[in-house]
């Protein structure tokens, strides 16, 4: 069972129509070069977003590429409505980051982007729309700095994706779907987490049903290899292997609509599990 999300990053450059689009595009290319060199793969969306029509096209491109996390990159000031709508419609974890100014030389008109100011407007517009996006503590940087910030977004995105598709399966004194007597779980629901409480007696019954399971010997061998010289209680390994298989089969049978699972046991001082 694969129990951790795989993050597939996409990056979309945005550009305000009174600034050169080529500036935002060339800066995005540099950021992606730095990211791929130091951290891994990232999908470069070919469409630069200037307006809502561009936003819809870019959204289709990142979805077609199966991206589940998105970087909105302000190569210049950026169109605050279109870029924040992109974050709203994407549906997954989104990060905003912006380009620092570079030496302009003789091309001040073409090489100045004011992305710092654009990031201020973007953050305000995100708040107005009640959009939760990841913004680094200092979200403006050179290509290598932006690449580093994007790499720090990956574990954040992984956590968000995991929570959105997580089910917590617990074992305690009450049967399944008897949540009226449970501890407060609203905040878990608010994060998109699903809860399924099961009776520990049902777990014990399932454990007994796994007695003599032909897979136990292979699990025991794996445990012995992992423990090595630390294997001081070899006699208990078959029962632990039986319990491990019980939990794995339970998880597979009960994951339902969710991709990721967490198994917990609700402890009560007055009860003992005979496993």
Go through the PLM ranges and name each one:
Residues 2-121, 129-131, 135-158, 165-169, ...:
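Metallocofactor- and cofactor-centric catalytic cores in central/energy metabolism, strongly enriched
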Residues 126:
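Peri-functional-center coupling elements
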Residues 264-275:
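Single conserved hydrophobic/aromatic residue that forms the stacking wall/gate
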């Amino acid at each position: 069972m694969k129990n951790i999300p795989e993050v597939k990053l996409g990056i979309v450059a945005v550009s305000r129509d009174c600034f050169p689009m080529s500036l935002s595009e060339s800066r995005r290319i540099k950021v992606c070069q730095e990211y791929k060199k130091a951290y891994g793969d990232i999908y470069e969306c070919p469409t630069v977003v200037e307006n809502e029509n561009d936003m819809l096209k870019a959204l289709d491109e990142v979805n077609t590429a199966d991206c589940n996390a998105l970087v909105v990159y302000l190569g210049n000031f950026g169109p605050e409505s279109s870029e924040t709508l992109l974050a709203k419609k994407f549906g997954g974890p989104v990060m905003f980051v912006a380009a620092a100014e570079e030496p302009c030389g003789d091309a001040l008109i073409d090489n100045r982007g004011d992305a710092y100011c654009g990031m201020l407007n973007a953050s305000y517009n995100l708040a107005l729309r009640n959009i939760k996006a990841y913004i680094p503590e200092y979200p403006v940087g050179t290509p290598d700095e932006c690449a580093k910030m994007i790499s720090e977004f990956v574990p954040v995105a992984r956590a968000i994706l995991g929570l959105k598709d997580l089910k917590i399966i617990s074992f305690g004194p009450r049967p399944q779907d008897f949540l009226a007597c449970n501890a407060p779980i609203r905040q878990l629901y608010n994060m998109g987490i699903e809860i399924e409480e099961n009776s520990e007696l049902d777990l014990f019954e399932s454990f007994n049903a796994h007695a003599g399971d032909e897979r136990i010997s292979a699990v025991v061998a794996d445990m012995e290899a992992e423990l090595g010289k630390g294997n001081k209680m070899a006699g208990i390994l078959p029962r632990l292997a039986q319990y491990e298989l019980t939990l794995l089969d339970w998880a597979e049978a009960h994951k339902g609509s969710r991709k990721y699972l967490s198994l917990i046991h609700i402890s009560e001082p007055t009860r003992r599990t005979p496993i």
